[in-house]
Design a protein with these regions (language model features):
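Non-catalytic substrate-recognition and accessory regions of acyl/acetyltransferase enzymes
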Residues: 1-164
Length: 164
């Protein structure tokens, strides 16, 4: 069962914006989830990201990423754990999906996010996202766009606040 190590989102500066961090663990595996608002103040970058997403990205849309905490601390992002560090439990990925859904729902409720953008950095992560997003949390996500961006590894989750 996931254990949420953060009581609230930790806010920290990220360029002109404030990013949000939430930590959790499953068994002995520590994870971090980061939310960074998509930059809309730079017209060239905003156009690039909007083209990638397939719509003009409004404010309050967030890039969301998660990784193992040790990868984040070492700067070797998305590196899989060694075989000896992998969980052997069959329901580990279900618990991981539950934790991510809970944290995204909490973020949505606190920050009234309009959309979340994510990129599956590895084929294994893409398979995980594809499986999880077959049944997104409908109280938060009303539309999922998958297969976006370079290599079709990108996702957009539009929320109930998207048109507000």
């Amino acid at each position: 069962m996931p254990v949420y190590l953060s009581d609230n989102f930790v806010e920290f500066p990220h360029g002109d914006y404030t990013a949000h961090r939430f930590d959790f663990c499953i068994e002995t595996h520590n994870f971090i989830v980061l939310f960074a608002e998509v930059i809309t103040s730079d017209p060239e970058y905003h156009d690039y990201r909007s083209d990638e997403a397939g719509f003009k990205i409004p404010t309050r849309c967030y890039d969301v990423k998660f990784d193992r905490l040790e990868n984040f601390e070492r700067g070797n992002f998305y590196e899989p754990p060694s075989k000896s560090q992998c969980s052997r439990r069959l329901n580990f990925t279900d618990e991981l999906a539950e934790a991510l859904e809970t944290i995204i729902t909490l973020h949505h409720n606190v920050y009234r996010a309009r959309a979340y953008l994510a990129v599956a950095e590895t084929p294994k992560l893409k398979r995980f996202y594809d499986r999880v997003l077959q049944q997104p949390p409908h109280d938060v996500v009303y539309k999922v766009n998958a297969g976006l961006g370079e290599g079709g590894m990108g996702y957009v989750l539009k929320t109930q606040y998207f048109n507000h």
